[in-house]
Amino acid sequence: GGGDASLIGVGAGAVEIGDAHIYSGTSGWVGTVVPEQMVDTGAMMAAIVGANPETFNYFGELETSNKCVGWVKDHLALDEIGVFLKRYGNATDSLEQVEFNMYDYLEEVIDTIPAGSNGVIFTPWLHGNRCPFEDPNAAGMFFNIRLNVGKTELIRAVVEGICFHMRWMLERQELKTTKYQKSKTVRFCGGGALGETTCQILADI
């Protein structure tokens, strides 16, 4: 048995020492299977008992992961959503299905923008930040907005910002975990992993 974080790793296939997985839901984390308890107080990372009591899961958490994409849907992407509803809206769809379809459409939209979002950078700290530095006052920001930047670049920058933060946490974890075994595959799971474009962005980063 185990908690949600440990069992999500099992479901993703991260069960052997050194296996790593990235989860992106409302919050997000990077978890690596390790054989012993460990703590990195400088990065606010710690290992908890895994679903297998002989192993531990070493976690670093992002307070708002795919929640940032939800914020985009509610505040930045209204024009794109209006286009979506006109093109693809179906009165017979459930609200849940419409929601999934809208996220799929936003994936198509950001796929039209080259990697790097025209230089725009986003920090995914919409509810403070936990790791690899703790600051409850940290906030989300866009950098490098110029006259030639549109909302589509901003939307893609949000996804890229989440993925860069995940890489940051993974690299910090590897300072301690590679003495065991470095994972050859990083598994990606959660609602954020449902989009092919997001998966490709994370893989590229």
Over which residues does each language-model region extend?
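Active-site core segments that coordinate phosphate-bearing ligands/cofactors
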Residues: G1-I205
